[in-house]
Amino acid sequence: MPRPTHHETSYLPALDGLRALAVIFVVLYHLDVPGFGGGLLGVGMFFTLSGFLITSLLIFTRERTGGLGLKTFWLRRARRLMPAVILVLVATLITAAIAVPKNFLSYLWEAISALFYVNNWYTIASSTSYFDRFGGPTPLSHMWSLSIEEQFYLVWPLLLALMFLVFKRRAVMTVVIVALALGSFWLLDALASPAFDNTRAYEGTDTRAGGLLLGAALAFWWPARKRQVNHTQRCWLDVLGLTGIGAIVYLVLTTHDNSMGLYTWGLALLTVATLGILAAAVAPDTLVATLLSLPPLRWIGERSYGIYLWHMPVVAFVPLAVRTDSPWVGAIVTLAVTVLLASLSWRFIENPIRKYGFAGALTGRRTDPDTAPAAPAGDAVAADVSAPADDAGIIVLPDLALADAAPPPRTVVEEPVDLTGVLGRTASTDETAGDVAEEPADEAAEERTPALAMIVLDHTDEPPATRHPDAGPGAEPDGSEDDAEQPDTDEP
C-alpha cells in the first residue's frame, strides 16, 4: 500500500462541524435536557479528534524537517489553550467570591488543579463524584477533560518520538498504538462497577486514552487532507460517515451516565463511530463533509473551545441570578450567556493571541521572532495554504489548528550538487531538495533525511501557515486557531 504523505492541507470546515456536534451534546447534557442523557459522550468525540489532529501535525512536521519540533509544539499548545482557561478561572473565582463565598476555597483548589492540568486526578483523589446530581453543578467540574488532553499533549509526542526511533515502520507502530488503546478500554471496563461511583473510570487518563490513541492510529493511514478519492470510495466513505453519525446520535439519545454499557462498549463504539466520521470529513466532496460544513455548524465549531470552557460556570451561577420555575427559561438564558461569553473570548482573547502572540495581541501586530507576517486571508487563499494541525480542542479541543506562521525561508547551497548518490535518482537543476524532502515515499527516503539536511537548511521546524476564511492568518482547519487543526481541540 502506498505510504500516505501528509501534505500541506487547507482549512477543513467539516471538522468544525464535528466539533459543533460534540459541544452541543455536552452542553445539552449539562443542562439536563430530556433525551440527552448520553450527551457526555461528546467529550469522547473531542478526544478522538484531538488524537487524530495532533498526530497528523507531528507526522507532517517529521516528514518536513526530520524531527517533531517539540519545543515549538508545546509552546503553541500553551498559547492556543491557556489564555482562555486563565480568563475562565479568574472570572469564576471572582464570581464565586461575590456570589457564594462559602464555596470559594473549594473552587480555588479546583482552579489550581485546572491551571496545571491535573484536575481529573485532583477530582479522583478528593473522592469527588462527577455524577453527583444532589450537590448541584460546580463551575469547574468539566475541567477534567482538558487536563487529560494536556497530559496527552505532553506525553504523546515523547512516546511517538520513541516509537519512530525503535520501530520505524508505521505498520508496527500502528499495531502498538492500537494495542495500547485496547488496553485502555479494557481498564475502563475493569474499573467500572454498578456498585460504586465511577468517576475513577470515567476521568482517569489511563482509562480515557483509548479514544485519543485510536485517533492517533488513524492519522498514520488517513492523512488530514485526502487529496483524491474516486466515486466508489466517496460513496463508501459517506456510508461510513453517515453510519458513524447515526451511531453517535443513537448513543447520545439512549445512553445514561449511570449505564454500565457506557464503560463496557459505549465509549469504544463512540470512538469507532467518530473515526468513521473523520475518515469521511477529511475527504474531498463527500456528503458528510458537506453536511458538517454548513455555516451554523462551522460558526459553533469555531467557538467550541470557548463554549465548552464557559458553559459550566454559567450553568452553576445563572440560577443564582435568574429566579424562575421554568427549566426552559433557565436553559435559554444559560445558552445565550454561554455563547455570548465564548464569542467575546474568541474575538478579543483567543483569536488575537493565536494570530499575533501574547504581546502582539495588544498592538495587533505579530511579534513572534520566528514567524513572518501572513497575507490577508480569503476563501481562495484558504483553499490552498495550510498544514495539518491538532484540535484541541475540545478539545477541544475545542479543542482542539494549523500552524500560524508563514513557511520559513530556506537556504539552498548555491554550487551545483550531484544528488544522485543521495537521492538514488537524478535531480534536475530546477527541482528543489525541499520538494523531495516533503514526500518520503519509502523507508529508505526517511533514512536519507540527514543527507538532505546538509543540502537544505531549514531555519525552523514549524509547519507552514494556515488560513481561516473568516478568522485570517493563524486559524486552524477545524475551527480553532493555531497548529491544531482548528483545540482544542479542541478542545474540551
Regions found by a protein language model. Name each.
Residues 192, 217, 232, 254-257, ...:
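Extracellular/periplasmic envelope-modification machinery, especially enzymes
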